[in-house]
């Protein structure tokens, strides 16, 4: 579903209301777009199918409200993706894939999209963690240091432990954003200490280099 102005207006109105509202109220709120009941119901049906909107009641008592996407995936692991100190979306680790949804507020604000992930209502599905997120994880010795200190090689878990992120993306397990501060120790800023206390990765510990005088 393309991000048509009326779609964004529906999400914005439901977000501001933050409660169930009737079709009649929505039509009045969206008078600028002159939607017919059938057109509005069709758009709402699509938003319901992609977990953006929830519905209650039936026939003349039907009401609509903004949906917290997480409510449909509570049994799965998920992390928040932060862009420029704003919650951009949610990355879920499903049983057979990774799924990313842009956050409703991020869409409503018409914020700048994450590279390679155009703003859209529908989720993105991946077999692996998408490259735009995975590239934040260091390689080589720095990756080994991070895995050793965090005691996990799971890239999904490692994302939330990063402090030295690339660009404007970061990852967190809660919606709370702590600007320019992290509770995780920076492995790059503590490199000497980490190498000294981890013999597994301190491969040069007992190396002696002899230099002969000429």
Where are the predicted features?
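Short amphipathic alpha-helical elements of helix-turn-helix/winged-helix folds
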Residues: 9-17
